[in-house]
Amino acid sequence: MTNDKSDFTQGSILKKLVAFMMPVLGALILQAAYGAVDLLVVGRFGSTAGLSGVSTGSQVLNLVTFVVTQLSMGITVLIGRYLGEKRPQLIGGVIGGGAVVFAVISVVLFAVMVTLARPISVLMQAPAEAVNLTATYVRICGSGIFFIVAYNVLAAIFRGLGDSKSPLMFVLVACIINIVGDLALVAGLHMDAAGAAIATVAAQACSVVFAVVLLVKRELPFTLKKENFRWNKQCLKFLQVGLPLAVQECLTQISFLALCAFINRLGLEASSGYGVACKIVNFAMLVPSALMQSMASFVSQNVGAGKHKRAKQSMFTGIGVGLVIGCCVFLLVFLKGDLLSSIFTTDAAVVAHAYDYLKGFAPETLGTAILFSMMGYFNGNNKTVFVMAQGLIQTLLVRLPLAYYMSIQPNASLTKIGMAAPISTAVGIVLCIGCYLYMHRGEKKV
């Protein structure tokens, strides 16, 4: 893993960035696919209440998953930094300390999700017909939260080492098992939302076992010792990077939970339509998300090696790649959102509501190509406190108030509610540009 392919400090930026990003994107696509399979199979073989339960419950699971992913970004950045600085002997402490920290987090999440599943479902304002199914989905996923957390931490370790292909294999295993599980439990045994949750947990568990076996057998550029598995100074270092990102992501996801609650008040069909739209949104956001994760690894190595100009060039390269793909995704979502929605359900009313939301959301596919590339650049530069601050501003001062205002209007429009996301992203871009200019003030133009 220390070969030329994982050395981002030399060679073509475009080729190396795309080569590293593609497996990351592939893993995200498969991850979104097995999440979409839950909704697809329940939509086809379950009930409308089950569809609403899975869509609402998956919002809670997304909150947990995305926060853990951002917190583990600290591990990715720190490993990349130590590789760039030629100090691989420090990586063992990062991984061992990370295992301890995330084990504690898993225990806390288990207790909260299992014991408070129903209050969480009520807080989410799940439709009355779907409260029990939502609580069941959350409770079962909470029971297996250790595997969900472990997968994301292991993926962060491999990406930090410059290996984006192994996480792709992990999620491929999970995707296959989840599809088989959904078909067996939901389509075959008619277990509705509960079957989808069991399949999700089983898939993640198998993926974690596969990842651990691969990590143990792999020739690593460092030594992992028993004494590494304790609280150590590396824990504070990766938390300094990851914690601000996790806080920002937590509030962002809470804003989406609040948005889900706003829309749930509009009825069962609107709730189900929003759930379908969210699955399409997850796919639409894959390229920006892959860029952000890849950019953090790419930039952290170059910053560690003192190649700051190359780090800046990689950000602009990422923006260019993101915008080219983003234009295609925008046209597909805006013009053919109804066709995409019909993949998940045959209910015409649900399809119509999903498409209404997508029409307002569509510009987000362009804005995030810029925003996420810049965020990845700042993450790699250890400017995660700023990333958190801009996230809080656009979430608490723009997205949530605007979405709430739109949701309480007479004959509330899902299209207008959907527009809250791209408007808040535009604010985030302005803040990022300001921070970038401030960081590089006084530098001579080349």
What spans do the regions from the language model cover?
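Short alpha-helical transmembrane segments in multi-pass integral membrane proteins
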Residues: 1-21, 79-146, 188-243, 299-364, ...
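N-terminal transmembrane alpha-helices
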Residues: 8-40, 44-45, 59-74, 78, ...
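Interfacial/gating helices of multi-pass transporter permease domains
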Residues: 19, 42-62, 129-133, 193-194, ...
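Transmembrane helical elements of multi-pass membrane transporters/channels
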Residues: 19-38, 140, 174, 203-207, ...
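Helix-terminus/linker motif at the lipid-water interface of multi-pass membrane proteins
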Residues: 29, 33-52, 121-128, 184-191, ...
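Alpha-helical transmembrane segments and their lipid-water interface positions
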Residues: 31, 35-42, 65-72, 76, ...
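Small-residue-rich hydrophobic transmembrane alpha-helices
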Residues: 51-111, 148-167, 273-337, 368-390
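Short runs within selected transmembrane alpha-helices of multi-pass transporters and secretion channels
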Residues: 72, 141-159, 167-175, 196-209, ...
